[in-house]
Structures are given as structure tokens and as C-alpha cells.
Amino acid sequence: MKSILNDFLLMIQFFTRIPINKNLQCEKANFRRGAFFLPVVASIIGGMEFLIYLGLKNFLPSNVIIVLLLLFTAMITGGLHMDGLADTCDGFFSLRDKERIIEIMKDSRIGSYGTIALIIDLLLKYQLLYSLVLKGYSIAIFLAPIIGRISILFLCLSKRTAKKNGSGNIFIGNMSKPIVFFISTIVLVLSTYFLGLRATIIPFIGALLITYLLYLLCLNKINGLTGDTLGACNELGEITFLLILLMM
């Protein structure tokens, strides 16, 4: 039980800015087991966002609430996944060789492609969430973060790391297939309860497809995955899920 609590708190500590004032075991095995709780952490984030929406919807216009939710997401996650998206775009669109791309991705300064990617990311999330709320799919506020993290888990089934050392290496190739598929089944059942089978399966398949395409792009550009590409995967998975859901 103590080990389970450690791994759960480790995921909260790693993926959010929620203060966990506790010394935790951070071995690779802890992250492997802790992956089980990544969608749980995402459900906490999505749940808080949905509660904020419910609490404000009678007082503020929906478009204003969505802006506040995007701000809240950036604060609660520290912009972790958006930073990964920006770094990935800066590197991949530089059209350099593998070593130079990785150097660019490690640079703490954001470039023009990263800036453009962040603007498009936020604009798409804003418009998609706002449109879905108007369409009666406000539950997408809760579900999208979970689907994004599921996309990360599937990407991490690959063992191809682009760097010998990197924060992403504690996840890449360190996932248990049975756990990933078990978690995905639970998420699909949950989503089906809220959205129905068709509105769950098709957007979910779309998110997995974009994850696979990103994987192929990563192999082509840097011969593997990094922590930044995992962050990019989360953002692309969320947006793809929301976009296809809106089209349903």
C-alpha cells in the first residue's frame, strides 16, 4: 500500500504543480508502476477544470470561462506539455540534422516555430472547447486531458529513445502493455458512459492515429523519442480528440 501511494504521489509531483511535501522513491520501477496513475492524475486535472466550468457557467459567458480554464491548465501543469510541443516544433521545423535538432529542443529559449505552435495550440483548444460546450459536450473539458495522457502511454510503448539521458527516458520503453491496455479500456468505458460508443471510439482512434504519425515523424527526425515529444503527443492527442468529437 505504501508503494502504491508513493507511485501515485510521484505522478502528481512530476506532472503537476500541486505541492507534495514528501520525499518519494524515484526509481525507474516507480515510474513504470506509476504510469497506471497517469490517467488518474489527468482525471484530477480535468475534474478540477470541469468543476470550475460548472461553478462559473451561471455567472460568466462560456468563452470567458474557457480562457480561464486554459490559464488554469497552464498553471496546474506548469505548461509542461505545451513546452514540449513548442520545443518539438522549434527542433523539427529547423530542418537540421539529428544532433542539431536535439540541441535546439534542449534550448530553454523559445523560437518562432515554437511560438507559432503555442498560439495555434491555444487557439484550437479555445475554439474547440467553446464549440463543444455550445453543442452540449461540456464533459469534453473533463475527458480531453485523460485522452492526451493515454496517448503518451501508447507512445511510450516504444523503446526508441533519441538521447542516452533525458527526462523522457524514465517513461519511454518503460511501460507495461497490459497496464496500458487495461487503463485504456477503463477510459473508453468512462467516455462511452458520457458520450456514447460512436462518439468515444472514433475520436479515440483518431488520437491514437496522430500519436502513431508523430512517432513516425520522430523516428525520421531524431531516430527516437524525447520528453519534449511526449509533451507534444499530449497536446496533439487532446486536440485531435476534441476536433473529431466536434465533427461527430
Curated annotation (Swiss-Prot):
InterPro entries: CobS
Pathway assigned in UniProt: Cofactor biosynthesis; adenosylcobalamin biosynthesis; adenosylcobalamin from cob(II)yrinate a,c-diamide: step 7/7
Subcellular location: Cell membrane
Broad class of the protein's primary localization: membrane
Keyword list, A-Z: Cell membrane, Cobalamin biosynthesis, Magnesium, Membrane, Transferase, Transmembrane, Transmembrane helix
Any single Gene Ontology cellular-component annotation: plasma membrane
Cofactor(s) this protein cannot do without: Mg(2+)
Keyword Membrane found: yes
Catalytic activity: alpha-ribazole + adenosylcob(III)inamide-GDP = adenosylcob(III)alamin + GMP + H(+); alpha-ribazole 5'-phosphate + adenosylcob(III)inamide-GDP = adenosylcob(III)alamin 5'-phosphate + GMP + H(+)
A GO molecular-function annotation: cobalamin 5'-phosphate synthase activity
UniProt record similarity statement: Belongs to the CobS family.
Protein name: Adenosylcobinamide-GDP ribazoletransferase
Organism field: Clostridium botulinum (strain Loch Maree / Type A3)
Gene (UniProt): cobS
